[in-house]
């Protein structure tokens, strides 16, 4: 039988001038080197034995932190809406665990709902690279796909490492925000690799999976403009669920586009017109990922910490505060101290508001999930103190590349006395890592109320020895209440 595509291609090549034939050949070669194929080759070649011990440890710490964030959001309205809507609209084999719930969902359903749980509190990890990113958003897809396939803890660690490294390489290479797009656009490229690796797909199938979901997942930065809504917690999980479905399509023979990211970089105006994807097998960006102490935007971590440090010196004297001066980076001022941030209307905007978060820290001596979930941020005393906050760009931050998060806070009283605090790096920054005790405390704080002390402790132990478990169900069975 004649291969129709080869017949047409051969006939066309024969009828074209020599120059045009060369162009066709070059185009085919370029397709083979397209980003989808390079990413798929990286994922296919990666295995547990190639991961250095410090990377394995980093993955386990990130799983612990991510599960803490997810359990902290169990019962939150956005997650309930997502779960109810998905179950009503889509059917699928019930094979994957929804965190904090009895009963199973489809892989895509668990990816979506668990993803919303992970992101909702704004407490999950942070990478301050070419664009800020929260790479732990890929972990729900990895757990769900691993659970469906019945793979091991080592397989899960490898898939998560692939998810992190490919996503962080993309945010460094593309510069999404400079083009008016959000870094969550990576979801459509990352999750087909995670699913493909766990499901034993070929490189070509993984590349097609990215070519199916990637072009649809370009997300406008408008989601972070003005008042922030629940959609902040949905965009990556939605893209991840679609990426998992795209991997299924590709595994069954559906083909996808190639060179999507190259086209995107060339056709949109951003910080670079070149697409240089650095995916060296010996470079692990996961080691540059930080954890969060406070449920706030990344740029607010040092500001909140400074406020907490100043709290004790202001006890009983807050009524006498005349002005609060904050010096921070230009990006932090633009993102967290615009006029709308002084009068937030939603929880999602409040935890991205410098004046509100600093006021909470100064008044309460901490900034917690409860302050947002129980509407403490809306209180008149918080708004009154927030109005006294003046934000300036720190001279030391001018020209400094992204990742500089130093903040200076000076509180001046009506008496003329002033108190000040400078924080160079936030607790949890890779250059100031969160301690094991602090990470354990964060985990137990959020997991114990859902699972109970005994099961929470067993889940934590399972995470610490993740590379030793033969079946990931040993982990996932502990994610739901007994």
Model-predicted segments: where are they?
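Terminal-appendage/accessory-domain detector
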Residues: 2-131, 224, 228-241, 248-482
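Generic structural signal for well-ordered, non-membrane alpha-helices
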Residues: 37, 41, 140, 161, ...
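Well-ordered alpha-helical scaffold segments within catalytic/enzyme domains
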Residues: 73, 142-149, 192-199, 246-250, ...
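A short glycine/small-residue-enriched secondary-structure motif
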Residues: 107-122, 135-140, 161-170
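Hydrophobic alpha-helical hairpins/lids featuring a short glycine-rich hinge
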Residues: 125-165
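Well-ordered alpha-helical segments within folded domains of soluble proteins
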Residues: 136-143, 187-194, 240-245, 300-304, ...
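Secondary-structure transition/capping motifs at alpha-helix termini
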Residues: 148-151, 198-204, 314-318
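Glycine-rich, mobile lid/loop segments that gate access to catalytic sites or pores
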Residues: 154-239
């Amino acid at each position: 039988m004649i291969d129709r595509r080869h017949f047409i291609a051969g006939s066309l090549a024969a009828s074209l001038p020599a120059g045009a034939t060369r162009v066709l050949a070059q185009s085919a070669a370029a397709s083979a080197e397209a980003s989808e194929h390079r990413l798929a080759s990286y994922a296919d070649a990666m295995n547990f034995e190639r991961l250095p011990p410090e990377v394995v440890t980093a993955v386990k710490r990130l799983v612990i932190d991510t599960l803490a964030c997810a359990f902290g959001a169990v019962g939150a309205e956005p997650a309930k809406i997502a779960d109810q809507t998905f179950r009503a609209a889509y059917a699928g084999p019930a094979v994957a665990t929804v965190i904090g719930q009895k009963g199973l969902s489809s892989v895509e359903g668990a990816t979506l709902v668990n993803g919303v749980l992970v992101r909702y509190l704004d407490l999950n990890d942070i990478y301050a690279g070419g664009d800020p990113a929260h790479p732990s958003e890929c972990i729900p897809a990895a757990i769900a796909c691993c659970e469906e396939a019945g793979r091991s803890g080592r397989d899960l660690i490898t898939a998560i490492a692939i998810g992190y490294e490919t996503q962080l390489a993309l945010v460094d290479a593309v510069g999404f925000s400079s083009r008016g797009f959000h870094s969550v656009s990576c979801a459509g490229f990352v999750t087909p690799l995670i699913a493909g690796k766990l499901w034993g797909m070929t490189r070509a199938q993984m590349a097609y999976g990215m070519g199916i979901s990637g072009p649809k997942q370009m997300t406008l930065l408008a989601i972070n403009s003005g008042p922030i809504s629940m959609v902040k917690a949905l965009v990556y999980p939605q893209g991840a669920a679609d990426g998992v479905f795209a991997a299924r399509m590709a595994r069954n023979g559906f083909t996808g586009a190639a060179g999507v990211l190259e086209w995107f970089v060339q056709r949109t105006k951003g910080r670079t017109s070149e697409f240089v994807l650095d995916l060296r097998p010996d470079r692990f960006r996961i080691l540059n990922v930080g954890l969060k102490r406070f449920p706030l935007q990344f740029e607010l971590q040092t500001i909140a910490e400074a406020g907490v440090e100043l709290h004790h010196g202001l006890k009983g004297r807050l009524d006498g505060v005349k002005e609060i001066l904050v010096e921070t980076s230009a990006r932090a001022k633009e993102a967290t101290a615009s006029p709308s941030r002084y009068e937030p209307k939603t929880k999602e905007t409040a935890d991205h508001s410098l004046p509100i978060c600093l006021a909470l820290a100064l008044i309460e001596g901490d900034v917690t999930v409860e302050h947002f979930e129980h509407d403490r941020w809306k209180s008149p005393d918080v708004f009154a103190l927030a109005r006294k906050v003046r934000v300036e760009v720190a001279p030391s931050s001018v020209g400094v590349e992204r990742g500089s998060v130093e903040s200076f806070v000076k509180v001046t009283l009506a008496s003329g006395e002033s108190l000040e605090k400078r924080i160079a790096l936030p607790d949890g920054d890779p250059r100031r890592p969160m301690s094991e005790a602090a990470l354990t405390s964060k985990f137990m704080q959020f997991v114990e109320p859902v699972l109970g002390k005994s099961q929470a402790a067993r889940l934590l132990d399972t995470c610490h020895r993740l590379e030793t478990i033969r079946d990931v169900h040993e982990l996932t069975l502990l994610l739901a209440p007994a």
